[in-house]
């Protein structure tokens, strides 16, 4: 071998590479066109395929030259050093930054704040407070070295059994849009981005990677896309995450009608779209995703880079589509802290953020019932029943979980306000919690990966009449906590999850009988991210407080409400039905099915099972209160409901047209004896038109400041004229019918305080004709 010749060849190659790197443009905000021209096809393909999530099941080896920048982060984009293109880091959310708390060879801890879940945040009906939470989460995202937080969850609560409802805000798109907008604005004010998810109609977790969500264009536009649209137009999120599921037969991540025609052309979106963490699909060509407008494949397979290169060379993929997506990626990258060289500290102000958590979780809690039981005064000792009193759940399972340094349970929260718990009962429960957690870890099904991400629900223990009789004389009152857990990859069941278990029902009845016999109060705390059945047992207790999954300060927040330190002002953002089957969507929803058993996995593969392979949205526009209110169906607690320790008086509302905007105003007075906040919910009843419409629909809302007794505040709420529109499928347009619109101000959807009328002229707005259904569905109608 001629070693001299070989050495000269290697040296020449190295010199050429160095010269090429030196002459190559270095990315900045003003030379993106130049950088794209300088990129090789392989480099362009690399930029469209993410990586870094080495622990993702089935993801295979990630792009080899990447390293982990932030341990536990969800993924990264690829660096191209030759062109000055850095990697960027994305972390899971949205209830806090999901990263590893401990790092090999590092004695420091990297715990993040566990903030209230999405449902709890939305139940504040306080966009200023939600924006403040977003700012805190954005700060932790920044200081822990991440560029994008994967959240917020913008999907609707189509059905109370959806396992991921805890991450989502509401059954209503307006609540979703306004709360989501505030959250995004807060996060992005810190110089980091969000990835609003899951776009779109990710309405169930069962078979979520391939279920076909079949629905009308009207329901799609008015309900499932409306919140996203509001958030995109008002907050400009850096990224949108496309959903796993199909929409009318087409995968969302390869749906050009969704990702380009609607998102970009109709709404004017300028950011990037990235896939949910699916990797490579066997039944969806990669070129279809790129062409559709999916800019980033996450978490990415090395083979996908070559797939893009081959598709361009074979004529299956237009290089113009590749360049378009590359441009969007570069426009995203130059905004990131990592590109700008931000020196993150790894030390956000967790103490300050805990205070924000406590404030927001307290304001999001909803008082469902209060028969002179709250606030508690003069209580020294309570009997604390229910496993979750001692293992209070701060958040849900899966990617939405947060690795936290502590979580305040009910025992600690009560102790902090000077209320003791009966010692023997406390010892029994605390010992059981230790045992049950150890057993759960030992017996864990290896397929149930999500149990390592979050706090699993422990089984309830039976409380005998003898036990209750022993505890009653030692306590001034009883508090029972009923807990529920759910999360990514699984939906809830009716029996034992939506409904009480027999053990739980027996506990409530036995405790109530014993304590009421002695004239003592019984208070129930619901520690759940989702709706539960209450109608069968609510008459047996004196007070019910929905604490949701309120973040790390949960026990303290509950104590703040119980003592009256904070007056409850939370309102339900979803209907609490009498039974789960009262929702018309339940007929088409997955139920009584366990995705983590091999038998069911085999059944699943058959490919045409209702509720699993496809879900027909036959309820159409009648989701949540739109159904119950229009069809006059009784509910346990209506949408928008929530009690206070004080009373409020609503003045006569007024409504005025101001150009393309409509201003609604109402004066609210605190007529009670303690300070409090109240929500004004603005519902609109439309005149009859070509399309059947719900009896009334929420269009906006406002919340007062803390009003002292006798104090008043005038709320002014603004909406656009186009917000009154229904979607006209026949003409692919939004249409406001001419006529008189009734603006109804309520404290909930059933409790209307005043009405004002506004005459509105016809208005239309053309849209793309996208995502039409491919099968005939039997839509629910009030008048057939």
Language-model segments: residues:
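Small side chains
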Residues: 13, 477-478, 754
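Glycoside hydrolase catalytic-domain context in secreted enzymes
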Residues: 21-726, 735-745, 749, 771-784
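Short beta-strand elements
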Residues: 751-767
């Amino acid at each position: 071998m001629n070693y001299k010749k070989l050495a000269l060849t290697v040296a020449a190659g190295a010199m050429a590479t160095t010269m090429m790197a030196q002459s190559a443009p270095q990315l900045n905000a003003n030379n993106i066109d130049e950088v794209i021209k300088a990129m090789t096809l392989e480099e362009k393909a690399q930029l469209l395929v993410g990586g870094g999530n080495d622990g993702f099941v089935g993801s295979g080896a990630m792009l080899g030259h990447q390293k982990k920048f932030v341990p536990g982060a969800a993924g990264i984009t690829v660096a191209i050093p030759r062109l000055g293109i850095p990697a960027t880091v994305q972390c899971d959310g949205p209830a806090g930054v999901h990263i590893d708390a401990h790092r090999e060879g590092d004695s420091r801890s990297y715990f993040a704040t566990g903030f209230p879940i999405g449902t709890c945040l939305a139940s504040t009906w306080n966009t200023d407070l939600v924006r403040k939470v977003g700012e805190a989460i954005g700060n932790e995202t920044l200081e822990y070295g991440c560029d994008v937080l994967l959240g917020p969850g913008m999907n609707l609560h189509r059905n109370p059994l959806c396992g991921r409802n805890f991450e989502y805000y509401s059954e209503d798109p307006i609540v979703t849009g306004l709360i989501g907008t505030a959250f995004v604005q807060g996060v992005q004010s810190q110089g980091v981005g969000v990835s609003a998810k899951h776009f779109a109609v990710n309405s169930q977790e069962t078979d979520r990677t391939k279920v076909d969500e079949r629905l009308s264009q009207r329901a799609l536009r008015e309900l499932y896309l409306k919140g996203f649209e509001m958030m995109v137009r008002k907050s400009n999120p850096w990224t949108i995450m496309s959903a796993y599921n199909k929409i009318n037969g087409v995968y969302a991540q390869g749906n050009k009608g969704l990702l380009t025609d609607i998102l970009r052309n109709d709404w004017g979106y300028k950011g990037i779209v990235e896939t949910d963490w699916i990797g490579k699909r066997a039944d969806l060509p990669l070129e279809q995703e790129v062409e559709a407008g999916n800019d980033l494949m996450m978490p990415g397979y090395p083979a996908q880079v070559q797939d893009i290169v081959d598709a361009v060379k074979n004529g299956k993929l237009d290089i113009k589509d590749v360049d378009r997506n590359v441009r969007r990626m570069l426009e995203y990258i130059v905004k990131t802290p990592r590109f700008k060289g931000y020196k993150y500290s790894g030390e956000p102000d967790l103490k300050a953020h805990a205070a924000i958590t406590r404030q927001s979780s307290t304001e999001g809690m909803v008082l469902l019932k209060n028969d002179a039981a709250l606030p508690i005064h003069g209580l020294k000792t309570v009997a604390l029943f229910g496993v979750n009193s001692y293992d209070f759940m701060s958040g849900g399972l899966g990617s939405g979980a947060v690795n936290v340094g502590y979580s305040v349970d009910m025992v600690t929260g009560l102790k902090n306000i000077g209320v003791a718990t009966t010692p023997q009962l406390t010892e029994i429960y605390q010992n059981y919690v230790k045992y049950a957690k150890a057993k759960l870890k030992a017996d864990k099904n290896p397929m149930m990966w999500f149990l390592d991400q979050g706090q699993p629900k422990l089984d309830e223990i039976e409380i005998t009449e003898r036990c209750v009789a022993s505890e009653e004389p030692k306590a001034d009152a009883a508090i029972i906590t009923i807990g529920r857990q759910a999360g990514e990859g699984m939906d809830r069941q009716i029996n034992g999850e939506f409904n009480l278990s027999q053990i739980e029902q027996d506990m409530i009845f036995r405790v109530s009988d014993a304590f009421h016999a002695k004239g003592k109060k019984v208070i129930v705390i619901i520690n759940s991210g989702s709706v539960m059945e209450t109608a069968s047992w609510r008459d047996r207790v004196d007070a019910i407080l929905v604490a949701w999954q309120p973040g790390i300060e949960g026990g303290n927040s509950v104590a703040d409400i119980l003592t009256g330190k904070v007056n409850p002002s939370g309102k339900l953002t979803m209907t609490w039905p009498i039974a789960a089957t009262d929702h018309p969507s339940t007929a088409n929803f997955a139920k009584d099915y366990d995705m983590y058993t091999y038998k069911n996995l085999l059944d699943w593969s058959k490919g045409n099972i209702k509720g699993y392979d496809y879900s027909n949205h036959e309820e159409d526009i009648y989701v949540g209160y739109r159904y119950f209110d229009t069809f006059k169906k009784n509910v346990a607690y209506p949408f928008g409901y929530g009690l206070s320790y004080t009373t409020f008086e609503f003045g006569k509302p007024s409504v005025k047209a101001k150009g393309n905007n409509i201003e609604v105003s109402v004066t609210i007075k605190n007529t009670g004896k303690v300070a409090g906040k109240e929500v004004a919910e603005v519902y609109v009843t439309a005149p009859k038109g070509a399309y059947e419409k719900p009896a009334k629909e929420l269009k906006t809302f406002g919340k007062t400041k803390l009003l002292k007794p006798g104090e008043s505040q005038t709320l002014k709420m603004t909406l656009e004229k186009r917000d009154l529109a229904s979607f006209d499928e026949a003409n692919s347009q939004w249409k406001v019918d001419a006529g008189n619109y009734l603006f109804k101000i309520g404290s909930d959807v059933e409790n209307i305080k005043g009405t004002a009328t506004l005459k509105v002229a016809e208005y239309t707005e053309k849209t793309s004709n996208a995502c039409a259904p491919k099968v005939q569905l039997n839509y629910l109608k009030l008048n057939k």
